[in-house]
Amino acid sequence: MHYTATVLLAFGMSMDAFAASIGKGATLHKPKFSEALRTGLIFGAVETLTPLIGWGLGILASKFVLEWNHWIAFVLLIFLGGRMIIEGIRGGSDEDETPLRRHSFWLLVTTAIATSLDAMAVGVGLAFLQVNIIATALAIGCATLIMSTLGMMIGRFIGPMLGKRAEILGGVVLIGIGVQILWTHFHG
């Protein structure tokens, strides 16, 4: 695959994580750059691994993976988005749950996995092409690290304007990504 195509693929694959990171950044009270970088590193690491996993699965069982990946992503994103919306509607005081707790490692990993399943599907497709899968996966991971970190910082400025509605908006974004993944699968 040509270098330009790899870069375009990498940034294209990072867009779901970018959108989710904006929502995450908006729900936190002024996240620090270190929190944004942590999010970027988690999203980037997962986004690096999923095309590699997809590539391996593509070699072994491409038909099954391609038939189910969109449903898995859809269910995970609907669940996570619904949870965020419910928490945003319930409200509660900021002391009830610290921003760091709402931004826990496992919640980030789950969100990263849900937004990276399309990269796994791309990895399945790459198994049938002459590509350097390691270089491609690293490019996707680096682009995702950059875009997720940037998304968190953008969310930092949007969050104070939205207040408690930021969590609802973040949930809507995740649900929207899930619907978009399902829509794209059925309507190309």
Curated annotation (Swiss-Prot):
Q: Which GO terms describe its cellular component?
A: plasma membrane
Would the keyword Membrane turn up in this protein's UniProt record?
yes
**What keywords appear on the UniProt entry?**
Cell inner membrane, Cell membrane, Ion transport, Manganese, Membrane, Transmembrane, Transmembrane helix, Transport
Q: Which domain of life is it from?
A: Bacteria
Which Pfam family is one of those matched by this entry? Mntp
Where would you say this protein principally sits, based on its record? membrane
Q: Which residues cross the membrane?
A: 3-23, 41-61, 66-86, 106-128, 143-163, 168-188
Q: Which GO terms describe its molecular function?
A: manganese ion transmembrane transporter activity
The cellular location(s) given in this protein's UniProt record come to: Cell inner membrane
Which InterPro entries does the annotation name? Mntp/YtaF (IPR003810), Put_MntP (IPR022929)
Q: What is the membrane topology here?
A: Multi-pass membrane protein
Q: Mind telling me which HAMAP family this protein's record contains?
A: MntP_pump
Q: What does this protein do?
A: Probably functions as a manganese efflux pump.
Family, as annotated = Belongs to the MntP (TC 9.B.29) family.
The entry's protein name is Probable manganese efflux pump MntP
Record organism:
Salmonella heidelberg (strain SL476)
